[in-house]
Amino acid sequence: MSTKSRTRSKTRLSRALGIPLTPKAAKYLEKRPYAPGEHGRSKRKQDSDYAVRLREKQRLRAQYGIREAQLKIAFQEARRTQGLTGENLVEILEQRLDALVVRSGLARTTAQARQLVVHRHIMVDGKIVDRPSFRVKAGQMIHVKPRSEGTEPFQVAAAGGHADVLPKLPPYLEVELDKLQARLVRLPKRAEVPVTCEVQLVVEYYAAR
């Protein structure tokens, strides 16, 4: 799929879910804040409970850019963990390496963060990690491989080039962009995680299956 096709696909999905998944989609939603398609402007019929839960699950999945199987595994772990399942789920997903790379400003989008990880540009505590799903522990340091620091994507990041499109830095991260590094100082809490999702509806979706 070409870059243009991927951008168009993300924009269409953003409109369907009502959330911006990329900076370009955010600008597009400002102009066309309705679902895609012939009847996008018209008032939708009231969705069924199932449709509402399904859309919320799709919202969460799309914001982390993960497959259904990955979300289901995370949900099962969240259900086994003490506390509220929905909050646990978001907190588990937020510890993904690709999520923290974009959250810290080292990448502009989740897709770019995943690419940087897969191409072995990202290290955790001095070791290269090429799995976007890697679970970062509290206290661990995420940083760019020294040989990659001079490349254009990271020079843009070091200059704060993504600040205009990313949410405010959450309190569970300490970031030194000039050094291209970020530390997960403690585990995230749901209320601090900048994702748009009614997590209880996601719990209800899986509970009904």
UniProtKB/Swiss-Prot annotation:
Pfam families documented for this protein: Ribosomal_S4 (PF00163), S4 (PF01479)
Stored InterPro entries: Ribosomal_uS4, Ribosomal_uS4_bac-type, Ribosomal_uS4_CS, Ribosomal_uS4_N, S4_RNA-bd, S4_RNA-bd_sf
Residue spans of biased composition, Basic residues class: 1-13
PROSITE patterns named in the record: RIBOSOMAL_S4, S4
Domain S4 RNA-binding: 95-160
CDD domains: S4
Single GO biological process annotation from the record: translation
Chain intervals for the UniProt region annotation (Disordered): 1-20, 28-49
GO cellular component terms, semicolon-separated: small ribosomal subunit
The keyword Metal-binding belongs to this UniProt entry's keyword annotation: no
Alphabetical UniProt keywords: Ribonucleoprotein, Ribosomal protein, RNA-binding, rRNA-binding
Gene3D superfamilies according to UniProt: Ribosomal Protein S4 Delta 41, Chain A, domain 1 (1.10.1050.10), RNA-binding S4 domain (3.10.290.10)
Database matches in SMART domains: Ribosomal_S4, S4
Single GO MF annotation: structural constituent of ribosome
Entry-linked NCBIfam families: PRK05327.1 (NF003717), rpsD_bact (TIGR01017)
Role summary: One of the primary rRNA binding proteins, it binds directly to 16S rRNA where it nucleates assembly of the body of the 30S subunit.
Family: Belongs to the universal ribosomal protein uS4 family.
Subunit description: Part of the 30S ribosomal subunit. Contacts protein S5. The interaction surface between S4 and S5 is involved in control of translational fidelity.
Name under which the protein is recorded: Small ribosomal subunit protein uS4
